């Protein structure tokens, strides 16, 4: 009997986890915009948060997650995240995944807004790379389709049945399946300053929107406080774990920035730290990480050390790393239930593209990799319960616009988005931005036009959500009022 087909859009940890749990019983295809190594998961320097120590409990992890999320989280989703977390971690360890140890015990790090150390790492600051590679090497029964950019989710009789893609020569490819899983990541490349991979430009969010899926909480975008900043440009993430190991944020004169701002000082929630640094920079101050108190920095952070050396940062002499906030993570996204189901039958969303409700208004550090693992498992478990979903693929050409479209240049769009929807927002600027967006067309006949069109759709969704939430909450800071 022919196996049912599962199409997964995205090659990060969420998609690979789902693929691993489905490939024995389903015909699984993973479609990825770039090469399979290109994902935010591969870049993740932090770790995986899980309540696995004797002094920790899921209840404590639940509390920290809710407080960081400004109590905008969904209770059942957070409960699933923190209770399943230790289980999925142990499952991975049993399958051969190795996490860093100290004195024969799992080494647990501390990060912002966690009340105690609970962060597992692998390869120091290379957890995302090690975990993604571990999963991908196990995907022996998966059909990989690399450098295929999804441009449209195909629907028939109200259900998702496939996806249209363009290869790097802009040739059309169509894939049909009984189950379509969006695992395409977030939207960092909407901004000129971001930690995200070059391929992450909100494609999955725009595809879902055009397929009539419900999206929510799009105003909640986390800006990471510390990107390496040199000569007016950012060059990747400096992990929060560096502050967890004792680094402090300082001005050029050496004065501490965070100690009078929040009780947790340098380990305050990311929205607080990012906004504080943004204000410092707006006042003309340079911002640095002082790593004087970080023991064995180069051993603990090998990937960051390599990056600093490549960019000729004299950190060994100065004990300083120049930093700047940048777009990092979307808390909102395609609304799903606890199994990753969207409102469109047979369309699922997992990982950063999804809004499961676990993060609320601001994500707790290292909960993102945990989310990918837990919900990757959950969507696979659910699909295993669904039988006899066979579809007959209809003739369904993509909805091309073949006339010459009117679209902005990518860098101009990025700058506009940063000015309007960055760390601090103003209603009048958002309204002006929405009017500007209305002057452009939609097109998907080439990868370039599709990407810019997806960026326009996604930024419009963010702007509309930001206008509706008239008071600040978590990562959404709008200059009309503040909700504590």
Curated annotation (Swiss-Prot):
The keyword Ribosomal protein does not apply. NCBIfam families: nadB, PRK08071.1. It catalyses: L-aspartate + O2 = iminosuccinate + H2O2. Pathway: Cofactor biosynthesis; NAD(+) biosynthesis; iminoaspartate from L-aspartate (oxidase route): step 1/1. Its main location: cytoplasm. It is an enzyme of class 1 (oxidoreductase). Catalyzes the oxidation of L-aspartate to iminoaspartate, the first step in the de novo biosynthesis of NAD(+). It is found in: Cytoplasm. Binds 1 FAD per subunit. It comes from the Bacteria. The active site is at residue 270. FAD binds at residues 11-14, 33, 40-47, 203, 352, 368-369. This is L-aspartate oxidase. Keywords: Cytoplasm, FAD, Flavoprotein, Nucleotide-binding, Oxidoreductase, Pyridine nucleotide biosynthesis. The keyword Cytoplasm applies. GO terms for molecular function: L-aspartate oxidase activity; nucleotide binding; steroid dehydrogenase activity, acting on the CH-CH group of donors. Its EC number is 1.4.3.16. GO terms for biological process: 'de novo' NAD biosynthetic process from L-aspartate. SUPFAM superfamilies: FAD/NAD(P)-binding domain (SSF51905), Succinate dehydrogenase/fumarate reductase flavoprotein C-terminal domain (SSF46977), Succinate dehydrogenase/fumarate reductase flavoprotein, catalytic domain (SSF56425). One of its GO terms (cellular component) is cytoplasm. Its cofactor is FAD. Signal peptide: none annotated.
């Amino acid at each position: 009997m022919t196996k049912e087909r599962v199409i997964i859009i995205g090659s990060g940890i969420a998609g690979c986890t789902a693929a691993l749990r489905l490939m024995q019983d389903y015909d699984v295809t993973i479609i990825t915009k770039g090469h399979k190594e290109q994902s935010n998961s591969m870049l993740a320097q932090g770790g995986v948060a899980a309540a696995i120590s004797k002094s920790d409990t899921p209840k404590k992890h639940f509390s920290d997650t809710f407080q960081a999320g400004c109590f905008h989280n969904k209770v059942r989703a957070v409960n699933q995240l923190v209770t399943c977390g230790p289980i999925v971690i142990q499952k991975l360890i049993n399958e051969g995944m190795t996490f860093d140890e100290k004195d024969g015990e799992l080494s647990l790090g501390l990060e912002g807004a966690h009340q105690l150390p609970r962060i597992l790492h692998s390869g120091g600051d290379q957890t995302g790379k090690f975990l993604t590679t571990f999963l991908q090497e196990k995907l022996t029964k998966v059909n990989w389709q690399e450098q295929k950019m999804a441009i449209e989710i195909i629907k028939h009789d109200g259900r998702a049945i496939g996806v249209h893609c363009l290869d790097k020569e802009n040739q059309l490819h169509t894939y049909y399946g009984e189950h379509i899983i969006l695992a395409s990541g977030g939207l960092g490349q909407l901004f000129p300053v971001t930690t995200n991979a070059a391929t992450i430009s909100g494609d999955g969010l725009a595809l879902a929107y055009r397929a009539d899926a419900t999206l929510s909480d799009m105003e909640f975008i986390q800006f990471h406080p510390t990107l390496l900043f040199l000569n007016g440009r950012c060059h990747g993430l400096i992990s929060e774990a560096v502050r967890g190991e004792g680094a402090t944020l300082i001005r050029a004169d050496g004065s501490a920035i965070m100690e009078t701002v929040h009780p947790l000082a340098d380990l305050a929630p990311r929205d607080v730290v990012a906004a504080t640094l943004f204000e410092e920079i707006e006042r003309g101050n340079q911002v640095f990480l002082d790593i004087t108190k970080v023991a064995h920095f180069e051993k603990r952070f090998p990937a960051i050390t390599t990056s600093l050396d490549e960019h000729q940062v004299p950190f060994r002499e100065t004990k300083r790393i120049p930093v700047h906030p940048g777009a990092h993570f979307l808390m909102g996204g395609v609304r799903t239930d606890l199994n990753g189901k969207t409102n469109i039958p047979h369309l699922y969303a997992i990982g950063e593209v999804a809004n499961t409700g676990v993060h609320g208004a601001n994500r707790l550090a290292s909960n993102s990799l945990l989310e990918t693992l837990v919900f990757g498992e959950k969507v696979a478990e659910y699909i295993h319960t669904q039988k006899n979903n066979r579809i007959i693929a209809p003739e369904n050409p993509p909805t091309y616009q073949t006339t010459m479209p009117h679209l902005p240049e990518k860098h101009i769009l990025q700058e506009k988005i940063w000015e309007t929807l960055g760390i601090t927002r103003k209603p009048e600027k958002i309204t002006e931005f929405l009017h500007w967006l209305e002057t452009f067309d939609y097109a998907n006949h080439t990868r370039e036009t599709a990407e810019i069109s997806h960026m326009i759709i996604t930024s419009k969704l963010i702007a509309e959500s930001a206008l509706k939430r008239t008071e600040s909450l978590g990562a959404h800071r709008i200059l009309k009022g503040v909700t504590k």
